[in-house]
Design a protein with these regions (language model features):
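A glycine-rich helix N-cap at a beta->alpha junction
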Residues: 96-106
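Conserved hydrophobic/aromatic beta-strand scaffold that supports enzyme active sites
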Residues: 98, 110, 119-121, 251
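Short beta-strand
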Residues: 111-112, 155
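Contiguous, glycine/small-aliphatic-enriched amphipathic segments in soluble metabolic enzymes
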Residues: 1-97, 134-223, 227-252, 256-258, ...
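Ligand-binding beta-strand-loop-alpha-helix segment within the catalytic cores
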Residues: 112-142
């Protein structure tokens, strides 16, 4: 029976309660064993501290070890506090980068998927001011190929993928920036030469997400974190799932944070965690 690992996240957050609710929901597929990793006694709901951050990190490290050394099929990660982790010396911007390193992956990407939208990110956890410096054709090629592979794995034989511009109006032919002409368009041409999916763009960012949500495209490649996540969370907040693409084994997580302010109050919705576990089972 395939084993799906679930890390508790920061035990001072809503991770423990949404995992309990998901496992009790009756909405998970049969034929899998679910193994929860983490020490819930290390945190008091709503009161994050170094001990709760340490417990979150210990759970991640144990999950990575099990993925490397056992037949565990996939991991679903509970929400962590990036700030809390960095205070105890965690050297990565987020869990995506942690698993890339821990599982010795060479090319990974971050994708979020919900009922209305699937969005891949060309850049991830960097300051907005750094995006123009860090955006290059290789980023776009990489996430484009990974996103096409993800869609095919989910049964879409000929994916249609829209690639966003970076600037307002997708640069308006150079009037508002040159990244579209110099970086994004060449990457789209390379992706189409690879023949793995139909890539179009650079699209005007403010319009393309509506088209994608209505089914014109199977996914959108966004140039930076909030460009992709604002429309996704507006439409799919309760059911969106974060997926790390390119790992040797699937990793998913809910698309929300620790929600320390409501932890322990019994009001956190488990929908995104349920969706994350279901997707991990599909991909395993």
């Amino acid at each position: 029976v395939p084993e799906i690992l679930i890390t508790l996240g920061d035990p001072a957050g809503i991770g423990p309660e949404i995992i309990d609710a998901a496992l009790a929901s009756g909405n998970l597929p049969d034929g899998f064993d679910f193994r929860v990793i983490g020490d819930r006694s290390a945190g008091t709901p709503g009161k994050p501290d170094r001990a709760s951050a340490r417990a979150a990190l210990d759970a991640l490290e144990e999950a990575a070890r099990l993925l490397r050394e056992t037949d565990a099929a996939a991991v679903v990660t509970g929400p962590v506090s990036k700030e809390g982790l960095q205070e105890i010396g965690f050297p990565f911007p987020g869990q995506t980068e942690f698993f890339t390193h821990a599982l010795h992956a060479t090319e990974t990407g971050m994708l979020l998927t919900g009922p209305h939208l699937t969005v891949g990110l060309a850049t991830i956890h960097i300051p907005l001011a750094e995006v123009p410096n860090q955006l290059n054709p290789q980023n776009i090629l990489s996430i484009g190929k990974l996103t096409a592979g993800f869609l095919k794995q989910r049964g879409i034989a000929q994916p249609r993928i829209a690639v966003c511009g970076l600037n307002p109006h997708a640069g308006e032919n150079g009037a508002f920036g040159h990244e579209e002409r110099n970086i994004i368009s060449p990457a789209i041409a390379s992706l189409n030469r690879a023949g793995i999916a139909t890539f179009t763009g650079p699209h005007v960012p403010d319009a393309v997400f509506r088209d994608a949500a209505q089914g014109t495209y199977h996914a959108v490649i966004a140039m930076y974190h909030d460009q992709g996540l604002i429309p996704l969370k507006l439409l799919d907040f309760d059911e969106a799932v974060n997926v790390t693409l390119g790992l040797p084994k699937p990793r998913t997580s809910p698309d929300h944070g620790t929600a320390f302010a409501i932890a322990g109050k019994g009001i956190a919705k488990p929908d995104s965690m349920i969706a994350a576990i279901r997707l991990a089972c599909q991909l395993a």
